[in-house]
Amino acid sequence: MTVAESTCALVSTQPSIGKPTGGIATYSPAYTIVPTYECFNRCTYCNFRTDPGESSWMSLSAAEDIFKRLQNEQVCEILILSGEVHPNSPKRQVWFQRIYDLCKLALTLGFLPHTNAGPLSFAEMQELKSVNVSMGLMLEQLTPKLLETVHRHAPSKLPELRLQQLEWAGELQIPFTTGLLLGIGETNDDCWETLEAISKLHQRYHHIQEVILQPHSPGNQQTFNAPAFNPHQLPEVIAKARQILPSDITIQIPPNLVKDERWLLACVEAGARDLGGIGPKDEVNPDYPHLQAEELREILQPAGWDLMPRLPVYPQFDGWLSGELQASVRRWRELVIGNW
């Protein structure tokens, strides 16, 4: 029985929202930079990748133009989201250097970088720590059976490889975001086991900021022939995740993948108190435009929820950052708290 099937029996056809409890939901004012869409993985649900040579790489000059324009807008996070170059490829070092240079440029121009570029070597993670306030990598699902289906042609989706990234992030004291992709063939137990693995690592290193619960949402590029994960089933999954995960890990959902306002509120009520990075475009789900902050406030405020901006690093992790990064974070905290 899949998560979709087993959860369906637990969730009614209407969201269970009683008297609003109210509180704070957060989001990160963000802009996504894609160094390259090129990727050696071929996940069948992907709507992001291109084949090598099909698209140009982001140049530093093009990125600088974007960053300078963004200096006049309320954007604090630069998400460096990249397709993956094979670790043994002769282009790997050039690829990594481009990512590092983009992070450094963003930092120099006043932004807070967060990188998600697939599995990295320990040395690569260590180097990127100096120019990122946080980093991330989705676990998606740890069950090895997906290596026979949606991840059949995706070498970097080996469960042990991705878990190793979370462990290295803990050893390096890198504030980290991870998450699950729901509705790609996993069972209910698979889902809970992935959450339990995250919980176990966090209890050892105390480094996980957020866990994203992302419903599979079909797009125009994918070859995976399966329906969307029903967002009406998300509240129960969120509630279970809240039971499994330590209380200092924030649960995040992408609001553009939960179109029904009532169900979005139900997700927040169930324990998803962060709505992720909000920017002009969702690069991973390009067929699903982001809801902007004002639209989200119109949904949340009548139910008693205040939507507040946050930085891509949570305050309890500031001490893990270098002096330079701490100074940038301190400036942003004063700005966000004082004016936004």
From Swiss-Prot:
Cysteine pairs forming cystine bridges in this chain are: none
Keyword terms: 4Fe-4S, Iron, Iron-sulfur, Lyase, Metal-binding, S-adenosyl-L-methionine
Pathway note: Cofactor biosynthesis; coenzyme F0 biosynthesis
Tell me the superkingdom of the source.
Answer: Bacteria
Pfam entry (one):
Radical_SAM
Cofactors needed by this protein, per the record, are:
[4Fe-4S] cluster
Q: What's the record's note on cofactor binding?
A: Binds 1 [4Fe-4S] cluster. The cluster is coordinated with 3 cysteines and an exchangeable S-adenosyl-L-methionine.
Any idea of its EC number?
4.3.1.32
- Identify the CDD domains for this entry: Radical_SAM
Residues covered by the Radical SAM core domain? 25-256
Q: Does the keyword Iron-sulfur apply?
A: yes
The answer on whether this UniProt entry bears the keyword Ubl conjugation reads no
Gene3D superfamilies reported in the protein's UniProt record: Aldolase class I
Tell me the subunit arrangement: Consists of two subunits, CofG and CofH.
Homology family: Belongs to the radical SAM superfamily. CofG family.
Q: What is this protein called?
A: 7,8-didemethyl-8-hydroxy-5-deazariboflavin synthase
This protein's species is Trichormus variabilis (strain ATCC 29413 / PCC 7937) (Anabaena variabilis)
Taxonomic lineage = Bacteria, Bacillati, Cyanobacteriota, Cyanophyceae, Nostocales
